[in-house]
Amino acid sequence: MPIITLPDGSQRQFDNPVSVLEVAQSIGSGLAKATIAGRVNGERRDACDMINDDSTLEIITAKDEDGLEIIRHSCAHLLGHAIKQLFPDVKMAIGPTIENGFYYDVDLDRSLTQEDLDTLEKRMSELAKTNYDVVKQRVTWQEARDTFEKRGEPYKMAILDENIAKDDHPALYHHQEYIDMCRGPHVPNMRFCHHFKLMKVAGAYWRGDSKNKMLQRIYGTAWADKKQLNGYLTRLEEAAKRDHRKIGKALDLYHMQEEAPGMVFWHNDGWTVFRELETFVRTKLKEYDYQEVKGPFMMDRVLWEKTGHWQNYGDLMFTTQSENREYAIKPMNCPGHVQIFNQGLKSYRDLPIRMAEFGSCHRNEPSGSLHGLMRVRGFTQDDAHIFCTEDQIESEVTSCIRMVYDIYGTFGFTDIAVKLSTRPEKRIGADEMWDRAEQGLANALKHNALEYEIQEGEGAFYGPKIEFALRDCLDREWQCGTIQLDFALPGRLNASYVAEDNDRRTPVMIHRAILGSIERFIGIITEEYAGFFPAWLAPVQAVVMNITDSQAEYVQKVVKQLSDAGLRVKADLRNEKVGFKVREHTLRRVPYMLVCGDKEIAEGKVSVRTRRGTDLGTYDVEDFIEILKQQVRGRELKLLGEG
């Protein structure tokens, strides 16, 4: 007679074992109709699963995050159902959920086209609209293998052979004549799976190993209702318009080429944005009492072995040899900063020492993962390392957190997800050290009243970390900032200070990055602003243009005034209509266009327009200069006339 405890604390007693769905039915028909699955004692279970003992139960519906993930997983099975009907010889591999959707890897003797995707999507819709029940069946390992051997599914048999114990009882899910194997849970009926779209096909090796056969990966998205689906597709369209690679080319910011994969060729305008970011961060370094240093970008293998990077990070390091010595190009700045700390005797009175660097780092990322500025091999980190005592950890981490929010707020990012990443399986240092490090970060987060998510096993090999992920205007998350405690590296590199009792102690090291990779951050803000950089960041802040040749001299005079005031300005004296010039510079996202005609010359003024098409009227040149300088000094996000 199980007693079921519901989320509100109420209890229901049943005479016999009861299914998740039956409990929902006992509460109400509306809830039963909405039930996708249940969370029994915290574990997700199918709606048909029986509850034999006293348990807690939460009903999962399409309104829950778990419910949406289950819908997506079931849509992957629906795709399998459809492709098996249209291409009976296809061999099914794996079909998991991913962010915003799902995919299925299939082995088919022909390449799928967009037309095939359209046909598949249509068949999926036809099947889903029949609202058939999904039937779950627990079988023995041998029964499952016999089932897939009979159905000619070698990949399913391989999963059973390699991943599932022979004494296990895997679950088979029956979609009419189609059978798939999965941990589940899945929807009880296909009425929940009406809102999806197949997105693209890509290649994927079986098991992710290039030695194995290349399969075709069909990507799809799925949502709880039509409004959510349409909203997502609209966001994708907007994201395509904001793609930093497209905007970067249109604005002549940078380029990349095959001879230097994952490396950026910065053009003048892109490098201007880069340097403005550096300048801004430098002002904050001064405000938060950091010293700026510069270390070598290549060091001997011996040092990297001491730090543990060679053993734990070697696959991602570029190496070279000279005079019978092996060197590694640095993938991160921390070992170099310890070398600087080690020069000269340090006292506890000297701590904390906050050491920052715009460090040029290189990582040998897989070529398939490279993506514009977002994933590169050569990048610049706004990196810092704080050497402190254990007693100073919380105050220093708190200062880092304050700096993170200060800088992100300047760019308009206020929705920030905070995550605490704990010890990974592959790590250095004793468990006691990890206990102290993880607790220190957790205490600082609690002290700052920050809600955070724990990411088990996602820390670096030398310490746990706090991650800050920015949520942009398209509701995407970008992980940028990190604060990382490290009790191991200073000791490995013999860093020490003289404590108050005159004993030598090893300092705690806090790794801190805010923008992360500056290249990646430029990619993020390019998409966030759609290339409409605020005036302080814009490569060109104003263009001064004439109407006829008679105003050319006045234009040059105005340009000199703005340039002498420290503003980035260009003249456009081409023999083109002023409307043509305005349109061209609008497409280049120049914040302000200053038009000089005979009337403006007579009054000593300029006519001001913004890139958004707002006519701001005429301004005295000096007045406009002061207004623009104020926008730049204040790092304001909006232009004149934008509220």
From Swiss-Prot:
Alphabetized GO MF terms: ATP binding; metal ion binding; threonine-tRNA ligase activity; tRNA binding
Region Catalytic, residue ranges: 243-534
Entry annotated with the keyword Cell division: no
Entry EC number(s): 6.1.1.3
Sites where the protein binds Zn(2+): C334, H385, H511
One Gene Ontology cellular component annotation held by this UniProt entry: cytosol
SUPFAM superfamilies, A to Z: Class II aaRS ABD-related, Class II aaRS and biotin synthetases, TGS-like, ThrRS/AlaRS common domain
Swiss-Prot/TrEMBL keywords: Aminoacyl-tRNA synthetase, ATP-binding, Cytoplasm, Ligase, Metal-binding, Nucleotide-binding, Protein biosynthesis, RNA-binding, tRNA-binding, Zinc
Subcellular location per the Swiss-Prot or TrEMBL entry: Cytoplasm
Keyword flag Protein transport: no
Cofactor mode of binding and number, as noted: Binds 1 zinc ion per subunit.
SMART domains xrefs: tRNA_SAD (SM00863)
Family matches, as PROSITE patterns: AA_TRNA_LIGASE_II, TGS
Cofactor(s) required, per the database record: Zn(2+)
Every TGS domain range: 1-61
Function: Catalyzes the attachment of threonine to tRNA(Thr) in a two-step reaction: L-threonine is first activated by ATP to form Thr-AMP and then transferred to the acceptor end of tRNA(Thr). Also edits incorrectly charged L-seryl-tRNA(Thr).
Family per record: Belongs to the class-II aminoacyl-tRNA synthetase family.
PANTHER family per UniProt: THREONINE--TRNA LIGASE, CHLOROPLASTIC_MITOCHONDRIAL 2, THREONINE-TRNA LIGASE
Subunit structure, interactors included: Homodimer.
Full protein name: Threonine--tRNA ligase
Organism of provenance: Actinobacillus succinogenes (strain ATCC 55618 / DSM 22257 / CCUG 43843 / 130Z)
